[in-house]
Design a protein with these regions (language model features):
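Acidic, turn-prone loop/beta-hairpin segments
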Residues: 125, 214, 218, 224-232, ...
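N-terminal catalytic cores of NTP/NDP-binding nucleotidyl/phosphoryl-transfer enzymes
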Residues: 72-134, 261-263, 375-407, 411, ...
Length: 994
């Protein structure tokens, strides 16, 4: 590189003063002493050009096997295993992936530099509905018209494509790992291990088949787990419906009396078999009078009712004609006024009150079906009746809700499922047969109104579950499914939670604890084909399930060798043990289960299929994912691990938030506010993306926008310039021959105390996963301690002293130590930039020069801890802060051009004057002024008294004048006497050079 280019590039290396002074040196043609100055020299460019440079570094890193070399270096050391939660391989990576993977890479890099053997095996989740849906959409497939093995092969090829795309995306972000051998959930060895986990749980009695309500997506036609549900606000119709009493148990006259229920899901009324009330609540029998002689009696126009019901209605109508236009309603006492007002009923009075428990067993006529609904008592475990909304009388359909199901079990209510897998109402839905459930809502409300069963309807906005993949509303629907019984190991799981270190501690642990304590059994079956089959056979004669240790072992062996396609390609006889017989009836003919395992069972089993299978540590040291994984991967992994081995699969759990845009809105294609990592890397560089992640409060939702990235880029430039300045000024330094600490200049010793603090603080930050604090520590060190102070002050020594002088080498020694440690601290952060810094640096003979990742993380040097120097320099820094303000004002007033043009007079009290006088030369150098004059004022108070507490009391009296004498042509300081335009020092240096 030419000297002219070097000098130009050094202009803005650190501070404004440095730039101005360097420029002036080069611009003065009449007496150009530039060839006598030690100007910075380095191949490390001022501009990073990261989008162009990083791919070159990335190529070299992976071609040279850096990851493998890191593992080899730390072989035999203590392990640290971060187990990767697998992203779905069904699309390109997004900003959330970048946040996740960069956090993981930062931790693994840091641990590796600390000497830990820290393998990182990236994973890919490839099975299940997420992939099926994408493959069907993008390839235009109809899974019902393609043979299962062919459809599965198509899905596999689809996931392979995106696995490769995502791999390149993660590598572009600088993520190191075993990318040649990732774990992929369609890998036959993994599938076989997963089947083994299922077998272990089945053997222990934790797996069962049952008919109960589950989340069901009518679009995807499959059951869903809680982790596959998203909630959105929707507007529904809430209705108040009259159920006429047909058997009052001698307590209530059935004559024109109804119980009023409330529901927001009219489509579930065909499944109603009960009305749940609160045992301890008070209920009122309320007589209501209607205006305008308009009959409101339930069922007046219902032609489908039987003869007795019609007789009752006729009697009611007769009363209406006689002027008795009234009826009686039962609802919770506390809600009477609210409901009457809502229904527009002005005339009503309470006839009688009852305790809820007295009403148990009363029978009501279903509004449009020829059956009765029984009054039952709720509880905290079943239907928990409240007096906040509705009527205190809860519509109960055991087939369509968790609490309803439990209520039905308790009170032996019939479970009637009238909606099929596509969401269509069936024969038992009466007049609504053949309707899609959502459309039947309106039809049911209109029918109830027309037939006078509807007291009131109104819109209500509430949070409602939606499918995570197709984004459509889902329903609760009772179907036969396979479940993992959480009750079987719930207490063990709660105990295991106590053994884990959770981040954030304040709510991470309690969140998981509450989820496990209150969760339902886990529905593990899915009505899809792309996944690991449930390894279950059924007796053709009696339908008894067949699962044995032998059958599991044989399926595992077949799958390991042939993959899970074998389940669909082979007969049951080929898959089962020889001479298998039904344990119940002795039959030897079997059929295979058609469903696959929940995709969360896939990833939730990786503690066995990856950690144990690959000989890694189990439990892992750390799981790190988004906070949505408390109900996803964190939980499924915990459940399968405790169920099979009695322990949590992880020692620590760390979670991050979601990525949102600059205004805090969720990123989405429809809003057009998403920024892809690929686009960010092309525009700004991956190191900027990494700094964005590490500068964020990642445990909360993380904002991302172009403005934020531009701000991060500015910080990056300051850090880069600091590194470049030190590289440029250590070009001729020999690391094998540093200046001993005791021989170093005091300011250089001070710089090393600051470095020691940086090492200490950043080590603590990395250990605590507090990357934001580490980022700020580094930024503060580079901008405040180095660029604005230390490096600005020592430039005179670096440029003008003899190259091998003790003064210059002392500064170089400090800079070398700082550059070395700072580069290593930055290595987990800006992983591309540091590779170039490392190659531009000087190194000791024994140091690995290939990459900073093969170096050890810096440790504190106790020799550099010097409290006396730290306290003294606190005062000097305060003096500089006070004086700099006056110098800036004088510069603005054109009294001086730069600080070297100044004669500075400081008037101070006796105590401060003494300190100033003792350190006069140091302070002059620190202030970067040509001349310093000190004046004592015995009446002035001490300004520096509490400097050790970073507290300045008042100000010095400071006067700024233009310096006296002439300016040295070489160092630009002013002196009373010059010889041939040179000061005494510069003249001596030139003599030595000649």
């Amino acid at each position: 590189m030419s000297e002219e280019k070097l000098n130009k590039n050094s202009e803005r290396a650190v501070t404004k003063d440095t730039g101005e002074n360097s420029q002036k040196i080069m611009s003065e043609e009449k007496k150009n002493y530039s060839d006598t100055l030690n100007l910075p020299q380095t191949d490390f460019k001022m501009r990073g050009n990261l989008p162009q440079r990083e791919p070159e570094i990335q190529k070299a890193i992976f071609e040279n096997g850096l990851y493998e070399k890191i593992l080899k270096k730390n072989e035999g050391h203590k392990h640290f295993v971060l187990h990767d939660g697998p992203p779905y391989a069904n699309g390109e990576i997004h900003a959330g992936h970048a946040l996740n993977k960069i956090l993981k890479d930062t931790i693994v890099r840091y641990k590796s530099m600390k000497g830990y053997y820290s393998p990182y095996i990236p994973g890919f989740d490839t099975h299940g509905m997420p992939t099926e849906k994408k493959a069907i959409e993008k390839l235009g497939l109809d899974r019902n018209k393609i043979p299962v093995p062919k459809f599965r092969d198509t899905c596999k090829e689809f996931t392979k494509k995106y696995k490769d795309i995502q791999t390149e995306g993660f590598k572009r972000l600088g993520v190191l790992g075993d990318w040649e051998h990732p774990y992929i959930t369609y890998d036959p060895k993994m599938e076989a291990r997963q089947i083994g986990v299922f077998g272990d749980m089945y053997k222990k009695g934790y797996i069962y088949r049952g008919l109960k309500p589950v989340y069901w997506c009518t679009d995807c036609e499959t059951a869903l787990a809680e982790a596959e549900i998203e909630y959105k606000d929707v507007t529904s119709t809430s209705i108040y419906v009259k159920f006429p009493i047909v058997d009052g148990k001698g307590l209530i006259d059935t004559d024109d009396t109804s119980i009023v229920i409330w529901t927001t899901t009219p489509w579930t009324l065909p499944g109603n078999t009960g009305i749940t009330i609160g045992a301890d609540f008070e209920y009122s029998l309320v007589k209501v009078n209607y205006k305008n002689d308009e009959s409101k009696f339930a069922g007046e126009a219902n032609s489908d009712l039987n003869v007795d019901d019609k007789k009752q209605i006729k009697e009611n109508n007769k009363k209406a004609v006689d002027g008795t236009n009234s009826e009686k309603l039962i609802l919770a006492t506390d809600l009477v006024d609210k409901v009457m007002k809502l229904a527009g009923i002005e005339e009503y009075r309470t006839i009688k009150t009852f305790k809820g428990s007295e009403l148990e067993g009363i029978l009501c006529k279903h509004p449009f079906l020829n059956r009765t609904s029984r009054v039952v008592l709720g509880s905290e475990v079943t239907v928990n009746v409240d007096l906040v909304e509705g009527t205190g009388c809860v519509h109960t359909a055991p087939a369509y809700g968790k609490e309803d199901y439990l209520q039905g079990l308790k009170d032996k209510l019939p479970m009637i499922v009238e909606v099929n897998e596509k969401g269509i109402q069936q024969d038992g839905a009466g007049p609504f047969k053949g309707m899609f459930y959502a459309k039947s809502n309106k039809a049911i409300v209109e029918w109830l109104d027309e037939h006078n069963f509807l007291l009131k309807s109104e819109p209500i906005t509430h949070s409602y579950p939606h499918c995570w993949r197709c984004k459509n509303p889902i329903i609760f629907r009772a179907t036969k499914q396979w479940f993992a019984s959480i009750d079987g190991f719930r207490e063990d799981t709660l105990k295991a939670i106590e053994t884990v270190k959770w981040h954030p501690l304040d709510w991470g642990k309690s969140r998981m604890y509450d989820m496990i304590k209150n969760r339902n059994d886990w529905c593990i079956s899915r009505q899809r084909t792309w996944g690991v089959p449930l390894p279950i056979f059924y007796c053709e004669k009696c339908n008894e399930p067949y699962v044995t240790e032998e059958s599991i072992a044989k399926i595992q062996e077949i799958v390991k060798n042939e993959g899970t396609n074998a389940w669909w390609e082979k007969t049951a006889e080929e898959l089962m043990p020889y001479n298998a017989k039904c344990p119940k009836c002795g039959c030897t003919q079997f059929t295979k289960e058609k469903d696959i395992m929940d995709v969360w069972f896939d990833s939730g089993s990786t503690h066995q299929s990856v950690l144990v299978e690959r000989g890694l540590d189990y439990p892992a040291d750390l799981y790190l994912e988004g906070n949505d994984q408390y109900r996803g991967w964190f939980q499924s992994s915990l459940l399968t691990s405790v169920a099979t081995n009695g322990i949590a699969p992880y020692k620590e759990v760390l979670c991050c938030g979601m990525v949102v845009d600059g205004q805090g809105k969720k990123m989405s294609k429809s809003l057009g506010n998403g920024i892809s990592p690929n686009d960010m890397s092309k525009k700004y560089g991956a190191d900027i993306v990494r700094l964005w992640v590490l500068s964020s409060d990642y445990e909360m939702d993380v904002n991302l926008s172009d403005e934020i990235l531009k701000g991060i880029s500015d910080v990056y430039r300051k850090i880069r310039n600091t590194l470049r300045y030190m590289l440029g000024n250590t070009y001729d330094f020999d690391p094998e021959n540093p200046v001993k600490y005791e021989d170093m200049q005091e300011i250089d010793k001070w710089a090393l105390t600051r470095l020691n603090k940086l090492i200490k603080d950043c080590t603590k930050d990395y250990d605590n996963y507090d990357f934001k604090n580490c980022y700020h520590d580094v930024n503060q060190f580079c901008v405040v301690d180095m660029s604005s102070f230390y490096l600005d002050i020592i430039k005179d020594r670096l440029y003008t002293e003899k190259a091998d002088s003790l003064l210059r080498r002392s500064a170089q020694t400090a800079m070398y130590y700082i550059l070395d440690a700072l580069t290593k601290i930055l290595t987990p952060m800006i992983s591309f930039t540091v590779e170039d810094v490392w190659k531009a640096m000087k190194h000791t003979k024994n140091e690995n020069v290939e990459s900073p990742m093969l170096a050890d993380y810096p440790v504190e040097n106790k020799e550099w801890d010097n409290n006396e120097i730290a306290e003294k320099w606190n005062k000097i820094i305060m003096i500089k802060d006070i004086a700099s303000k006056e110098l800036e004002l004088s510069r603005a007033d054109k009294v001086i051009g730069n600080s070297l043009d100044a004669l500075l007079t400081i008037t101070a009290g006796t105590e401060d004057y003494k300190f100033l006088k003792e350190n006069e030369k140091i302070i002059r150098d620190v202030l970067i002024v040509s001349q310093l004059k000190l004046v004592e004022n015995k009446n002035a108070k001490s300004v520096l008294k509490n400097a050790d507490k970073n507290n300045v009391e008042g100000n010095f009296e400071i006067k700024v004048e233009h310096a006296k004498g002439e300016k040295c042509d070489r160092c630009w300081q002013y002196f009373e006497h010059l010889e041939d335009g040179l000061c005494e020092r510069c003249k001596n240096v030139l003599k030595q050079l000649n």
